[in-house]
């Protein structure tokens, strides 16, 4: 059972305007007693007071469901566990091999793109379907440390695959079944709302060929890539591994993110 924010605020509101002095003490006792009784009732029944600020949790958040928990150990140590091989040919790569874009693989009724926008943007405004994000603010953008406004249909905000799908294809994903490829394409651990410009200049670059201009975010960025490659069993090139180690050696205590979705999508999803 959940009490909505509107109900909770109403029950805990106090009058701030001037009131006659007579009877004030008695009213305060009653009001405080009512609030205390309500709190006791909630603790006994297991109810939650649900609050909604109308904003996302931000790109660096490690909240439940964000795909950004930190229970996986040190990121630098995890680099050594990644297999090292050469980049395979890009032959046969097609975005359709990873399923239709933004499939609802977590079955929450909203597509993956809107899930990530709700997670990473602030001041989020939704349509009446409670899924479609109409507007919000990427504040700050993790790649540039600037604020980028989001408006549905004409936005400068992209959802980046931290490990690009083409890069994944050339480093193991071409050997997977469709279910695993669809899972990677929609895993919150591998997705981030970012400024469209830097994202498009990144292309399918790996750590050896592209890093965000915002140096303060580089450790987090590389740790996320390491976490995704470890989770899905993707390999790295020698140059990529060296670049990962170089970045993470500047932040040896950087945690390895964990969480996200399962590594196989529900059977109802198909890929070309």
Located regions from the model:
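Hydrophobic helical h-region of N-terminal Sec-dependent signal peptides
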Residues: 35-40
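Bacterial signal peptide processing site
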Residues: 48-51
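Bacterial N-terminal signal peptides that target proteins for export
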Residues: 4-34
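C-terminal motif of bacterial Sec signal peptides marking the signal peptidase cleavage site
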Residues: 43-46
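Composition-driven, intrinsically disordered low-complexity tracts enriched in small residues
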Residues: 54-64, 83, 261-272
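Cell wall/extracellular polymer interaction/catalysis modules
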Residues: 63-142, 146, 153-154, 167
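Domain-level detector of nuclease and nuclease-like folds
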Residues: 142-272
């Amino acid at each position: 059972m959940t009490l909505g924010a509107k109900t909770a605020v109403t029950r805990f509101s106090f009058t701030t305007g001037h009131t006659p002095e007579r009877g004030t003490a008695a009213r305060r006792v009653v009001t405080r007693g009512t609030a205390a009784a309500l709190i006791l009732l909630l603790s006994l029944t297991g109810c939650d007071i649900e609050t909604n600020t109308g904003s996302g949790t931000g790109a660096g958040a490690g909240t439940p469901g964000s795909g950004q928990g930190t229970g996986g150990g040190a990121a630098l140590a995890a680099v050594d566990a990644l297999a090292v091989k050469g980049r395979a040919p890009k032959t046969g790569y097609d975005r359709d091999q990873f399923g239709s874009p933004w499939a609802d693989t977590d079955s929450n009724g909203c597509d993956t793109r809107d899930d990530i926008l709700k997670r990473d943007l602030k001041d989020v405004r939704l349509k009446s379907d409670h899924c479609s994000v109409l507007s919000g603010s990427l504040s700050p953008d993790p790649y540039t440390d600037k604020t980028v406004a989001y408006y549905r249909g004409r936005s400068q905000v992209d959802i980046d695959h931290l490990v690009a799908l083409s890069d994944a294809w050339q480093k193991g994903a071409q050997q997977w079944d469709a279910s695993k490829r669809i899972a990677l394409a929609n895993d919150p651990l591998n997705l981030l709302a970012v400024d469209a410009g830097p994202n498009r200049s990144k292309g399918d670059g790996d750590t050896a060929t592209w890093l965000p201009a915002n140096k303060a975010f580089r450790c987090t960025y590389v740790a996320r890539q390491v976490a995704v490659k470890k989770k899905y069993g993707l390999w790295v090139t020698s140059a990529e591994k060296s670049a990962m180690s170089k970045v993470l050696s500047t932040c040896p205590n950087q945690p390895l993110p964990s969480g996200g979705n399962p590594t196989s999508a529900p059977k109802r999803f198909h890929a070309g």
